[in-house]
């Protein structure tokens, strides 16, 4: 797939900016806080309807403007598609494909696929379990767009069940309350779908990431990725997962009512990353943690390509400066011209002449993009 054009209106610090991509690799050069990352974020939103910055929709819209708009033209093996995403301060979104508004956002997902790699991704190793859950969910949305709807359903039931548990805190109702049993059943049904899909996705991703990690580390370190769901998972069969889920809910009913929150379910899952059988967050240097994240990102690229049968876009947000020369070379050698790549950087000295000669170079200053070097 190839992103041909991108048009941003009132998005972040872009007032009205069109970009045409003319090479497999585009390098966006500029000082910090000029808008380089914002452009990559716009592409990420088209791919996943999510931002790794965890921003609210009102953060995307320029002050005193009612909406922000992202338009793009994408070329795939199946033909050319025009994508449109309108963001509003109140969080209501409109998506359109080839000029036709789509009733379900799920139908917009999967048209454009992209893997984002930024310095924030080191949090995958050293951050909280929520960071790893969000990463896995974002990958799953691209592998299986219906997952976005499943996850939304689960989160909605979870919010409603938590609200009901808070009511029970100050009432005389017991754990045998019939309304709670209804919420339990809904949580189990939707949560089981989340658990099974996360388990399947990691089962496919883990061997790819392990192989990349072995290659990058020179076979000196062994990476293991384990999905440890909050609900005990013996076999990935829906009936067994549902039974285990319901049993754990019933066991934790008293502490749940006491605390007014749901203590069982995939919102408490963990993805364990270990190097040489030691938790990665405790293991070694930042360089070793970067190797792990690089292996995860290369595995994402490979898995998405296997599933969708086309190479996804790669969005590299100021990460080359964070990698040592050997890891840089591993990444750049993998990319070549196989993946359309958008790269942000503050200077061009990280790139060798061959890369620069085969790349489109754009300069970014205060939300304006040009082919001149005025921002140097």
Swiss-Prot record:
The keyword DNA repair applies. The gene is recF. The lineage of its organism: Bacteria, Bacillati, Cyanobacteriota, Cyanophyceae, Nostocales. PROSITE patterns: RECF_1, RECF_2. The RecF protein is involved in DNA metabolism; it is required for DNA replication and normal SOS inducibility. RecF binds preferentially to single-stranded, linear DNA. It also seems to bind ATP. InterPro entries: DNA-binding_RecF, DNA-binding_RecF_CS, P-loop_NTPase, RecF/RecN/SMC_N, RecF_2. It is found in: Cytoplasm. The keyword Membrane does not apply. Belongs to the RecF family. GO terms for cellular component: cytoplasm. Keywords: ATP-binding, Cytoplasm, DNA damage, DNA repair, DNA replication, DNA-binding, Nucleotide-binding, SOS response. It comes from Nostoc sp. (strain PCC 7120 / SAG 25.82 / UTEX 2576). This is DNA replication and repair protein RecF. PANTHER family: DNA REPLICATION AND REPAIR PROTEIN RECF. GO terms for biological process: DNA replication; DNA synthesis involved in DNA repair; double-strand break repair; SOS response. GO terms for molecular function: ATP binding; single-stranded DNA binding. ATP binds at residues 30-37.
């Amino acid at each position: 797939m190839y992103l041909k054009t991108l048009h941003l209106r009132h998005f972040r610090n872009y007032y009205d900016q069109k970009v045409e991509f003319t090479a497999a690799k585009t390098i966006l050069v500029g000082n910090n806080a000029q808008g380089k990352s914002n452009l990559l974020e716009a592409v990420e939103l088209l791919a996943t309807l999510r931002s790794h910055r965890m921003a609210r929709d009102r953060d995307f819209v320029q002050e005193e403007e009612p909406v922000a708009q992202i338009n793009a033209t994408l070329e795939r093996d199946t033909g050319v598609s025009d994508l449109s995403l309108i963001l509003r301060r109140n969080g209501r979104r409109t998506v359109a494909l080839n000029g036709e508004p789509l009733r379900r956002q799920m139908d917009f997902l999967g048209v454009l696929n992209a893997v984002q790699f930024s310095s924030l991704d080191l949090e995958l190793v050293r951050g909280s379990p929520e960071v790893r859950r969000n990463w896995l969910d974002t990958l799953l949305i691209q592998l299986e767009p219906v997952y976005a709807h499943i996850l939304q359903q689960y989160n909605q039931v979870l919010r409603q069940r938590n609200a009901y548990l808070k009511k029970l805190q100050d009432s005389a109702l017991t754990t045998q309350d019939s309304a709670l049993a209804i919420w339990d059943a809904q949580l189990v049904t939707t949560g089981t779908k989340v658990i099974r899909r996360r388990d399947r996705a990691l089962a496919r991703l883990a061997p790819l990431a392990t192989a990349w990690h072995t290659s990058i580390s020179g076979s000196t370190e062994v990476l293991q990725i384990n999905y440890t769901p909050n609900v005990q998972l013996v076999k990935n069969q829906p009936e067994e997962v549902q039974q285990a889920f319901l049993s754990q809910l019933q066991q934790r009913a008293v502490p749940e009512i006491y605390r007014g929150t749901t203590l069982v379910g995939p919102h408490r899952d963990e993805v364990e990353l270990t190097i040489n059988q030691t938790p990665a967050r405790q293991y070694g240097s930042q360089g070793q943690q970067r190797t792990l994240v690089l292996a995860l990102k290369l595995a994402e690229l490979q898995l998405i390509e296997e599933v969708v049968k086309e190479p996804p876009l790669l969005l590299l947000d100021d990460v080359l400066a964070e990698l040592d020369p050997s890891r840089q070379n591993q990444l750049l050698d993998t990319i070549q011209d196989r993946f359309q790549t958008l790269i942000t950087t503050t200077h061009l000295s990280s790139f060798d002449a061959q890369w620069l000669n085969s790349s489109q170079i754009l300069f970014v200053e205060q939300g304006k993009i040009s082919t001149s070097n005025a921002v140097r």
